[in-house]
C-alpha cells in the first residue's frame, strides 16, 4: 500500500491526459506546471515524475499532461529500485504511446496537411478525423498508423534521464516562495525555471521529435507514384543532415522554448484568477468542481498555446524543402495570411481523443502491474 501511495489513480491519468500541449509542454511538465486545486490537492493529484510534488508557495504542484503521469521513485529507495521504476516507466510509456499512436499520427497529419499539400505530398485536404483515418488506411495500410511511433517511444528514456539531471539545479536556482517572496517574483521564477529546465531537456531530444514528426507526416506522395520521402528513422537524420545540416534537425526549436513559457504563464494566470472565484462556499471542497476546474484550466492553457505547436511543426516540415520560413514569426504570419487562424488549431480535436486513449490504456496497464507484481511501478511520461 505504501508503494501505491505515490502512484496516480485512474482519474488522475484521465485528467492528465487531457492536456492539449505536445513536446514543448513536456519541458513544462518536467517542472510541475499544474497546481492542484482545493480538494483536488488531497484526492486527485499525484507527485510528478520530476520533483515528487514540489511545493511552491504553499501550492502543491503536480503534473497534468498529454502523456501519462510518471511517479518517480522516492530517493530513499536507492538506485536499484529507481532503475526498476525507470525501466517499468519506459514499458508503460511504450504501451501508452503505442496504443495511442494511430490517433497521434492522424493528429499530426491533420495539423500539417497544408504544408504537405504545398510540397506535393498530399493530393487534397482531409475532411476530418474519420476521413484522415480512412484515407491513411486505404492508401498506406493499417500498420502505417504507427509510423513514427518508434522515435516517440525512444524519446522517453533520454527525456526522463535529462529531467532527473536538471531538476535539482533549476529547483535551487529559482526557489521562490509565494508567501515569502511575493506573487510576481514566484510567478516569474516559475516561468524562468520551467523555461530553463524545459529548454535544457528539449535541446537533447528535439531531433527525435523532429524525426517523429517527419515520419508521421510522410504520406505516400500524391504525385510521386506512392513513394515515401523517408525509409525510416536513420534515413530522416541522414537526408536532413545532407540537405540542411544540424540546423534542419532543430528547425522550430526557439518557438518550442517560447511555448514552454507561454503555457506556464497561461496556466498559472488562469489558476490564480479562477480558483478564488469558482471554488467558494459549498464548492470549496467539492471533488467534481475541483476536477472540472483543473480540467478546464489545463485544456484552456493547452488550447491557447496550441498554435505554437502548429507553427513549430510546420517549420519542421520545411527542412529539406527549397522554400522555408524565415522565422517563427514569418511562419505565423504566412499561415494566418494564406490559410486563416483556423489552420493554427488543426488537429486539436484528435489530440483530445489521443489523450483519452492513452489514459485508458495506462489505467489498464496499472492494474496488470498490480496483478502480476503486487504493486504499481512508474507510469511513463514525456
Swiss-Prot record:
Annotated localization: Mitochondrion inner membrane
Protein name, per record: ADP,ATP carrier protein, mitochondrial
Gene3D superfamilies: Mitochondrial carrier domain (1.50.40.10)
Region span, Important for transport activity: 312-317
Protein species of origin: Oryza sativa subsp. japonica (Rice)
Function: ADP:ATP antiporter that mediates import of ADP into the mitochondrial matrix for ATP synthesis, and export of ATP out to fuel the cell. Cycles between the cytoplasmic-open state (c-state) and the matrix-open state (m-state): operates by the alternating access mechanism with a single substrate-binding site intermittently exposed to either the cytosolic (c-state) or matrix (m-state) side of the inner mitochondrial membrane.
Recorded domain comment: The transmembrane helices are not perpendicular to the plane of the membrane, but cross the membrane at an angle. At least 2 of the odd-numbered transmembrane helices exhibit a sharp kink, due to the presence of a conserved proline residue.
Keyword terms: Antiport, Membrane, Mitochondrion, Mitochondrion inner membrane, Repeat, Transit peptide, Transmembrane, Transmembrane helix, Transport
Entry-linked SUPFAM superfamilies: Mitochondrial carrier
Topology relative to the membrane: Multi-pass membrane protein
Binding site for ADP: 155, 167, 312
Family affiliation: Belongs to the mitochondrial carrier (TC 2.A.29) family.
